[in-house]
Amino acid sequence: MGKQKIRIRLKAFDHRILDQSSEKIVETAKRTGAAVSGPIPLPTEKSIYTILRSPHVNKDSREQFEMRTHKRLIDILEPNPKTVDALMRLDLPAGVDIEIKL
């Protein structure tokens, strides 16, 4: 595998498990001899939902909820087959969305 790059995008609502997952991926890639760039923090996506507090009247009384999606980007440069195999066997916590591009 010459001059190839694996790009991994991680998304999660909780930044702590996102950082733990990215550290696991970086450590695994470095242990197998690949060069790693990252984890690079990407902008946090914030979704705001506004609802009425009352089921009947009082439109002026509203409540807002927000959901933050934290993102990280990891580039693995010059991966070897051992790196790919180790990443496939890696066990990451639930709640982390992983997107891998070769």
From Swiss-Prot:
Does Ribosomal protein appear among the keywords? yes
UniProt entry keywords in alphabetical sequence = Ribonucleoprotein, Ribosomal protein
Question: What is the scientific name of the source organism?
Answer: Heliobacterium modesticaldum (strain ATCC 51547 / Ice1)
Question: Has keyword Ribosomal protein?
Answer: yes
Protein name (record): Small ribosomal subunit protein uS10
Superkingdom classification of source: Bacteria
Q: Which gene encodes it?
A: rpsJ
| Gene Ontology biological process | translation
GO terms under cellular component: ribonucleoprotein complex; ribosome
Recorded GO MF terms: structural constituent of ribosome; tRNA binding
- Which family is this protein grouped under? Belongs to the universal ribosomal protein uS10 family.
Main function: Involved in the binding of tRNA to the ribosomes.
Subunit info? Answer: Part of the 30S ribosomal subunit.
Q: Which SUPFAM superfamilies match?
A: Ribosomal protein S10
